[in-house]
């Protein structure tokens, strides 16, 4: 009967309501409702899984992109470090080669040309502080062949690794990042102020050098104060074609870039005498220097610090010329 009635519906002989009732019974009897539910559940599951896959895929792309960015930053940082290291090494190797080719250490006694005396005619330097460490013998002809801008050679007795040729450029920028061979290198050169006399005859000669992290150039200069190296020796040497000049350190301080430490004087007047006395009083350590006066010849060694506006400065006055 159900089949006949259903067939009659299909032939258009039953009403729409009856047809719907018979159709629903037919679906119910054959379990087709559960099939519809299952189909709907299956469709929802597929949609949910598709959404999850899309979400997972987008999340995966994000992390991959983040990884690639991190990798790029790492590679760039490594490149920077390697470049800096190679630059440091190049500078160190160059100065070592120059030192080996142009200097030798000698233990031969030095001949006195002139030594500083006080107003009473007594030597400024006491006998117990006579020369115990000779400066290097410098072949200035060989140095001048490398660079005609060379004006001297600097060496600190307490820190013998601070032993470098001194240059002078037409301005204070040229040798800031150029070596003695005039090749670009961040370490640059040890150089005197462009306005100073090249023979160190000025009242105050300023000598600049970088505070290199690898300890080269003036990278160890602060050890004179911070590590107490001045206790080993408070003397430094400047060798020139005209002679070997010995200087006694009388001041070590941190100074602002605009400080009067960098004042240049045209003559040994009272103003310069006041300046020398002031520098001695500003020293982080009382060097107990005797006989400071307006007649002194001063060299000012200056290097940068971690503070861009501050410099570490070591000042010394001439006490003798030798050969």
Regions found by a protein language model. Name each.
Residues 74-323:
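Solvent-exposed, non-transmembrane regions of membrane-associated and secreted proteins
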Residues 1-106, 304:
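Gram-positive cell-envelope targeting signals
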């Amino acid at each position: 009967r159900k089949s006949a009635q259903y067939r009659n519906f299909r032939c258009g002989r039953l009403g729409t309501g009856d047809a719907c009732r018979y159709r629903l019974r037919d679906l119910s009897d054959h379990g087709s409702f559960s099939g519809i539910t299952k189909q709907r559940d299956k469709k929802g599951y597929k949609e949910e899984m598709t959404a999850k896959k899309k979400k997972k895929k987008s999340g995966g792309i994000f992390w991959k992109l983040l990884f690639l960015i991190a990798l790029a930053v790492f590679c760039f940082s490594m490149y920077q470090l390697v470049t800096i290291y190679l630059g440091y090494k190049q500078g160190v190797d160059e100065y070592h080669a120059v030192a080996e080719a142009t200097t030798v250490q000698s233990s031969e006694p030095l001949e006195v040309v002139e030594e500083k005396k006080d107003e009473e005619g007594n030597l400024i330097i006491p006998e117990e502080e006579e020369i115990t460490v000779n400066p290097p013998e410098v072949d200035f002809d060989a140095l001048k062949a490398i660079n005609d801008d060379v004006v001297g050679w600097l060496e600190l007795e307490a820190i013998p690794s601070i032993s470098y040729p001194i240059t002078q450029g037409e301005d204070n920028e040229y040798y800031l990042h150029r070596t003695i061979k005039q090749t670009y290198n961040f370490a640059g050169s040890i150089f005197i102020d462009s306005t100073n006399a090249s023979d160190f005859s000025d009242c105050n000669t300023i000598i600049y050098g970088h505070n290199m992290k690898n300890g080269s150039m003036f990278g160890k200069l602060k050890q004179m104060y911070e590590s107490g190296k001045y206790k080993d020796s408070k003397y430094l040497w400047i060798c020139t074609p005209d002679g070997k000049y010995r200087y006694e350190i009388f001041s070590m301080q941190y100074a602002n870039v605009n400080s009067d430490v960098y004042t240049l004087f045209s003559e040994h007047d009272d103003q310069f005498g006041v300046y020398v006395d002031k520098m001695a009083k500003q020293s982080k350590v009382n060097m107990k220097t005797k006989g400071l006066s307006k007649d002194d010849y001063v060299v000012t060694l200056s290097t940068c610090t971690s503070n861009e506006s501050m410099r570490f400065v070591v000042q010394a006055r001439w006490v003798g010329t030798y050969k």
